[in-house]
Amino acid sequence: MLFVSTTRHANPKTSSLLRSLWVPAALVALIGAAVRVGMLATVAAAQDDKLWGLLNKWDAKHYVEIARGGYFGADISTDGPVHETTMAFFPGFPFLVRAISSILGTGEAGTAIALNVLFSIALAAGVMALAAQMGMGKWAQVLSAVVVTSAPMSIVFSMPYTEALFGALAIWAVVALVGERWWAAAAYIFVAGLVRLTAVDLVAVFGLMVLLRARKNWRAWAAVAFSIVPLVGYLWWSSSHLKE
Protein backbone atom coordinates (compact mmCIF):
# COMPACT_ATOMS: atom_id res chain seq x y z
CA MET A 1 0.00 0.00 0.00
CA LEU A 2 1.44 3.35 -0.99
CA PHE A 3 1.04 6.27 1.40
CA VAL A 4 2.00 9.69 0.14
CA SER A 5 2.93 12.50 2.49
CA THR A 6 0.95 15.69 2.03
CA THR A 7 3.55 17.81 3.80
CA ARG A 8 5.97 20.16 2.09
CA HIS A 9 8.76 17.66 2.73
CA ALA A 10 7.22 14.76 0.80
CA ASN A 11 9.68 12.11 -0.33
CA PRO A 12 10.67 13.01 -3.94
CA LYS A 13 10.76 9.32 -4.92
CA THR A 14 7.25 8.81 -3.54
CA SER A 15 5.92 11.87 -5.34
CA SER A 16 7.56 10.72 -8.57
CA LEU A 17 6.04 7.25 -8.19
CA LEU A 18 2.62 8.80 -7.64
CA ARG A 19 2.88 10.82 -10.84
CA SER A 20 4.44 8.11 -12.99
CA LEU A 21 2.43 5.10 -11.83
CA TRP A 22 -0.66 5.68 -9.72
CA VAL A 23 -2.07 8.76 -11.45
CA PRO A 24 -1.95 7.20 -14.95
CA ALA A 25 -3.28 3.93 -13.52
CA ALA A 26 -6.20 5.75 -11.92
CA LEU A 27 -7.00 7.52 -15.19
CA VAL A 28 -6.87 4.25 -17.15
CA ALA A 29 -9.09 2.44 -14.65
CA LEU A 30 -11.61 5.24 -14.14
CA ILE A 31 -11.98 6.13 -17.81
CA GLY A 32 -12.29 2.45 -18.69
CA ALA A 33 -14.94 1.93 -16.02
CA ALA A 34 -16.89 4.96 -17.22
CA VAL A 35 -16.85 3.68 -20.80
CA ARG A 36 -17.90 0.15 -19.82
CA VAL A 37 -20.69 1.26 -17.51
CA GLY A 38 -21.83 3.84 -20.06
CA MET A 39 -22.08 1.18 -22.75
CA LEU A 40 -23.98 -1.11 -20.39
CA ALA A 41 -26.34 1.75 -19.52
CA THR A 42 -27.02 2.23 -23.22
CA VAL A 43 -27.80 -1.48 -23.60
CA ALA A 44 -30.03 -1.36 -20.52
CA ALA A 45 -31.98 1.60 -21.88
CA ALA A 46 -32.38 -0.05 -25.29
CA GLN A 47 -33.78 -3.19 -23.65
CA ASP A 48 -35.92 -1.28 -21.14
CA ASP A 49 -33.81 -2.75 -18.35
CA LYS A 50 -32.17 -1.24 -15.27
CA LEU A 51 -28.44 -0.61 -15.11
CA TRP A 52 -28.23 -1.47 -11.40
CA GLY A 53 -29.90 -4.80 -12.03
CA LEU A 54 -27.44 -5.65 -14.80
CA LEU A 55 -24.47 -4.73 -12.60
CA ASN A 56 -25.72 -7.15 -9.97
CA LYS A 57 -26.47 -10.17 -12.17
CA TRP A 58 -24.97 -13.65 -12.22
CA ASP A 59 -22.46 -14.46 -9.49
CA ALA A 60 -22.63 -10.88 -8.22
CA LYS A 61 -25.85 -11.87 -6.45
CA HIS A 62 -24.06 -14.65 -4.61
CA TYR A 63 -21.19 -12.45 -3.45
CA VAL A 64 -23.58 -9.77 -2.21
CA GLU A 65 -25.77 -12.28 -0.39
CA ILE A 66 -22.76 -13.95 1.24
CA ALA A 67 -21.66 -10.50 2.39
CA ARG A 68 -25.11 -9.94 3.88
CA GLY A 69 -25.89 -13.28 5.45
CA GLY A 70 -22.75 -15.39 5.41
CA TYR A 71 -22.44 -18.86 3.95
CA PHE A 72 -25.37 -20.30 5.87
CA GLY A 73 -27.73 -17.31 5.88
CA ALA A 74 -27.49 -16.06 2.30
CA ASP A 75 -30.84 -15.47 0.60
CA ILE A 76 -30.22 -17.55 -2.51
CA SER A 77 -32.63 -19.94 -4.22
CA THR A 78 -31.14 -23.44 -4.28
CA ASP A 79 -32.38 -27.00 -4.53
CA GLY A 80 -30.50 -28.01 -1.38
CA PRO A 81 -28.87 -26.40 1.65
CA VAL A 82 -27.72 -22.89 0.78
CA HIS A 83 -24.14 -23.50 1.89
CA GLU A 84 -23.74 -26.16 -0.80
CA THR A 85 -23.92 -23.28 -3.28
CA THR A 86 -22.32 -20.44 -1.34
CA MET A 87 -19.19 -22.38 -0.40
CA ALA A 88 -18.18 -22.43 -4.04
CA PHE A 89 -17.23 -18.79 -3.44
CA PHE A 90 -14.14 -17.98 -1.40
CA PRO A 91 -14.60 -15.69 1.64
CA GLY A 92 -12.05 -12.93 1.07
CA PHE A 93 -14.09 -10.58 -1.11
CA PRO A 94 -17.58 -10.93 0.41
CA PHE A 95 -16.32 -10.66 3.97
CA LEU A 96 -14.22 -7.61 3.09
CA VAL A 97 -17.37 -6.07 1.60
CA ARG A 98 -19.28 -6.95 4.75
CA ALA A 99 -16.66 -5.34 6.99
CA ILE A 100 -16.43 -2.12 4.98
CA SER A 101 -20.20 -1.78 4.57
CA SER A 102 -20.66 -2.30 8.31
CA ILE A 103 -18.10 0.39 9.12
CA LEU A 104 -19.45 2.91 6.61
CA GLY A 105 -23.12 1.99 6.89
CA THR A 106 -23.40 1.50 3.13
CA GLY A 107 -25.14 -1.20 1.10
CA GLU A 108 -23.19 -4.32 0.25
CA ALA A 109 -23.65 -4.09 -3.52
CA GLY A 110 -22.58 -0.46 -3.72
CA THR A 111 -19.64 -1.10 -1.40
CA ALA A 112 -18.49 -4.01 -3.56
CA ILE A 113 -18.61 -1.91 -6.72
CA ALA A 114 -16.76 0.99 -5.07
CA LEU A 115 -14.06 -1.36 -3.79
CA ASN A 116 -13.64 -2.79 -7.26
CA VAL A 117 -12.94 0.69 -8.60
CA LEU A 118 -9.98 0.87 -6.21
CA PHE A 119 -8.89 -2.67 -7.04
CA SER A 120 -9.03 -1.85 -10.77
CA ILE A 121 -6.67 1.06 -10.17
CA ALA A 122 -4.32 -1.26 -8.29
CA LEU A 123 -4.54 -3.76 -11.16
CA ALA A 124 -3.69 -1.11 -13.73
CA ALA A 125 -0.79 0.12 -11.60
CA GLY A 126 0.52 -3.43 -11.26
CA VAL A 127 0.45 -3.97 -15.01
CA MET A 128 2.36 -0.73 -15.52
CA ALA A 129 4.91 -1.71 -12.86
CA LEU A 130 5.46 -5.09 -14.54
CA ALA A 131 5.81 -3.44 -17.94
CA ALA A 132 8.40 -1.09 -16.44
CA GLN A 133 10.32 -4.08 -15.06
CA MET A 134 10.39 -5.46 -18.60
CA GLY A 135 11.98 -2.25 -19.86
CA MET A 136 8.95 -0.75 -21.58
CA GLY A 137 8.55 3.01 -21.94
CA LYS A 138 5.83 5.11 -20.32
CA TRP A 139 3.33 4.93 -23.16
CA ALA A 140 3.83 1.18 -23.52
CA GLN A 141 3.16 0.84 -19.80
CA VAL A 142 -0.07 2.80 -20.10
CA LEU A 143 -1.14 0.84 -23.19
CA SER A 144 -0.46 -2.42 -21.34
CA ALA A 145 -2.76 -1.29 -18.53
CA VAL A 146 -5.45 -0.32 -21.04
CA VAL A 147 -5.26 -3.73 -22.74
CA VAL A 148 -5.52 -5.67 -19.47
CA THR A 149 -8.28 -3.59 -17.90
CA SER A 150 -10.29 -3.51 -21.14
CA ALA A 151 -10.17 -7.24 -21.86
CA PRO A 152 -13.38 -9.01 -22.94
CA MET A 153 -15.92 -9.15 -20.09
CA SER A 154 -13.99 -6.48 -18.18
CA ILE A 155 -17.39 -5.14 -17.11
CA VAL A 156 -16.97 -7.51 -14.14
CA PHE A 157 -14.39 -5.03 -12.82
CA SER A 158 -17.38 -2.75 -12.22
CA MET A 159 -19.57 -5.44 -10.67
CA PRO A 160 -19.53 -7.27 -7.30
CA TYR A 161 -17.06 -9.85 -8.64
CA THR A 162 -13.58 -10.92 -7.51
CA GLU A 163 -11.75 -10.38 -10.80
CA ALA A 164 -10.45 -6.88 -10.00
CA LEU A 165 -9.20 -7.85 -6.54
CA PHE A 166 -7.68 -11.14 -7.64
CA GLY A 167 -6.16 -9.55 -10.73
CA ALA A 168 -4.50 -6.84 -8.64
CA LEU A 169 -3.11 -9.37 -6.18
CA ALA A 170 -1.89 -11.64 -8.97
CA ILE A 171 -0.12 -8.93 -10.94
CA TRP A 172 1.59 -7.46 -7.88
CA ALA A 173 2.63 -10.97 -6.86
CA VAL A 174 4.28 -11.37 -10.26
CA VAL A 175 6.00 -7.98 -9.86
CA ALA A 176 7.36 -9.17 -6.51
CA LEU A 177 8.46 -12.52 -7.97
CA VAL A 178 10.33 -10.87 -10.83
CA GLY A 179 12.10 -8.72 -8.25
CA GLU A 180 12.81 -11.83 -6.12
CA ARG A 181 11.01 -10.30 -3.14
CA TRP A 182 9.81 -13.65 -1.90
CA TRP A 183 7.93 -12.59 1.22
CA ALA A 184 6.16 -9.75 -0.57
CA ALA A 185 5.03 -12.28 -3.18
CA ALA A 186 3.95 -14.64 -0.40
CA ALA A 187 1.81 -11.91 1.17
CA TYR A 188 0.00 -11.18 -2.11
CA ILE A 189 -0.57 -14.87 -2.84
CA PHE A 190 -1.66 -15.52 0.75
CA VAL A 191 -4.45 -12.95 0.36
CA ALA A 192 -5.28 -14.23 -3.15
CA GLY A 193 -5.82 -17.66 -1.59
CA LEU A 194 -8.73 -16.16 0.33
CA VAL A 195 -10.27 -14.81 -2.87
CA ARG A 196 -10.24 -17.48 -5.60
CA LEU A 197 -9.30 -21.11 -6.12
CA THR A 198 -7.12 -20.02 -9.04
CA ALA A 199 -4.60 -18.82 -6.44
CA VAL A 200 -3.26 -22.37 -6.78
CA ASP A 201 -1.74 -21.26 -10.10
CA LEU A 202 0.09 -18.44 -8.33
CA VAL A 203 1.44 -20.89 -5.76
CA ALA A 204 2.67 -23.15 -8.57
CA VAL A 205 4.43 -20.25 -10.30
CA PHE A 206 5.89 -19.16 -6.96
CA GLY A 207 7.33 -22.62 -6.36
CA LEU A 208 8.76 -22.76 -9.87
CA MET A 209 10.40 -19.34 -9.50
CA VAL A 210 12.02 -20.33 -6.21
CA LEU A 211 13.17 -23.62 -7.74
CA LEU A 212 14.82 -21.78 -10.61
CA ARG A 213 16.24 -18.78 -8.77
CA ALA A 214 16.56 -19.56 -5.07
CA ARG A 215 16.43 -23.31 -4.60
CA LYS A 216 18.91 -23.22 -1.68
CA ASN A 217 17.15 -20.35 0.10
CA TRP A 218 15.07 -21.89 2.89
CA ARG A 219 13.39 -18.55 3.59
CA ALA A 220 12.06 -18.50 0.04
CA TRP A 221 10.66 -22.01 0.45
CA ALA A 222 9.12 -20.97 3.77
CA ALA A 223 7.42 -18.11 1.93
CA VAL A 224 5.99 -20.59 -0.60
CA ALA A 225 4.62 -22.76 2.22
CA PHE A 226 3.14 -19.71 3.95
CA SER A 227 1.40 -18.51 0.79
CA ILE A 228 -0.69 -21.66 0.41
CA VAL A 229 -2.09 -21.73 3.96
CA PRO A 230 -5.43 -19.90 3.40
CA LEU A 231 -6.16 -21.79 0.18
CA VAL A 232 -5.68 -25.17 1.83
CA GLY A 233 -7.41 -23.98 4.99
CA TYR A 234 -10.57 -22.85 3.20
CA LEU A 235 -10.78 -25.99 1.10
CA TRP A 236 -10.45 -28.11 4.25
CA TRP A 237 -13.06 -26.06 6.12
CA SER A 238 -15.61 -26.01 3.29
CA SER A 239 -15.10 -29.71 2.55
CA SER A 240 -15.78 -30.56 6.19
CA HIS A 241 -19.18 -28.85 5.93
CA LEU A 242 -20.04 -30.25 2.52
CA LYS A 243 -19.51 -33.79 3.81
CA GLU A 244 -22.26 -33.33 6.41
Predicted regions span which residues?
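Start-transfer (signal-anchor) and selected internal transmembrane alpha helices
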Residues: M1-A46, A132, R219, A223
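Membrane-lumen/periplasm interface segments of specific transmembrane helices
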Residues: I31-K50, L55, A199, V203-E244
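Extracytosolic helix-loop segments that constitute the early lumenal/periplasmic catalytic or substrate-binding loops
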Residues: A46-Q47, K57-H83, G92, K243
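Loop-to-helix entry region of an early transmembrane alpha helix in multi-pass inner-membrane enzymes
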Residues: P81-V82, P91, F95, I103-A125
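Hydrophobic transmembrane alpha-helices
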Residues: V97, S101, A124-M128, A132, ...
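Transmembrane-helix signature of polytopic, membrane-embedded enzymes
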Residues: G107-G110, V127-S150, A168
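Membrane-interface alpha helices of multi-pass inner-membrane proteins
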Residues: T149, A170-V175, W183-V210, A225-L231
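Short acidic/glycine- and proline-prone juxtamembrane loop motifs at membrane-interface regions
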Residues: S158-L165
